[in-house]
């Protein structure tokens, strides 16, 4: 089973401080995560949502702002003694703006996760793995973030990525966007935006250009797109399929 991180390839882009302008997985909420993992995923989302519904009158709840898609938040913690898919936990699902912010406000920031942990946000029905049918023919825009920026830029870049997803900021090509992953690693962290059609150059390029602009990355910095099929081959000379 392939992991949702991509690392160590020669063509990956490293964002440095001067370059930044600005079904096996088990369903579990934060309260359902096993005791050994709880320190990496605090807070009870179910409890918070129940509390919100108790405290807000029906007329307020009726004014919730629906999202175009229903989204699923996943949490991964690397444990080599377990199968890869058994390390993947479904945290929660949401389909309104208000629930998105409730989720984001009650989980750890990406920068606070332990090394070897991931967050993934994907459209409902798409698993955060290469083998999923919606991902097989796709690829990802990959951003590698210098570890010195973890506590300065990682959370901003990840939040902006999430807002791009739930806000459908990729216009007509939002349908080709599957989700995004943030990998917390010892040397460099990574953020990847996954799309479904690696051969759709027009769509991939439009998504990449909008994404780069939304992240506030310098025009002098090149970010690359890699097809999942190429990444799965684990080539030491993996070349970017597209760049912006």
UniProtKB/Swiss-Prot annotation:
- Give the coiled coil ranges: none
Arranged from A to Z, the UniProt key words for this protein are: Initiation factor, Protein biosynthesis, RNA-binding
Region listing for EIF4EBP1/2/3 binding, in residue ranges? 65-68, 101-105, 160-167
Instruction: Write out the ranges of the annotated region (Disordered).
Output: 1-57
Note the superkingdom of the native organism.
Eukaryota
Concerning Pfam families, the annotation shows: IF4E
Q: Provide the binding site for mRNA.
A: 84-85, 130-131, 185-190, 233-235
Q: Name one GO molecular function term.
A: RNA binding
Bias (Basic and acidic residues): 1-26
Cited InterPro entries? TIF_eIF4e-like, TIF_eIF_4E, TIF_eIF_4E_CS
An example GO CC term for this entry is: cytoplasm
What protein family is recorded? Belongs to the eukaryotic initiation factor 4E family.
Protein role: Recognizes and binds the 7-methylguanosine-containing mRNA cap during an early step in the initiation of protein synthesis and facilitates ribosome binding by inducing the unwinding of the mRNAs secondary structures.
Subunit structure as annotated in this protein's UniProt entry: EIF4F is a multi-subunit complex, the composition of which varies with external and internal environmental conditions. It is composed of at least EIF4A, EIF4E and EIF4G.
Protein known as? Eukaryotic translation initiation factor 4E type 1B
Organism of derivation? Mus musculus
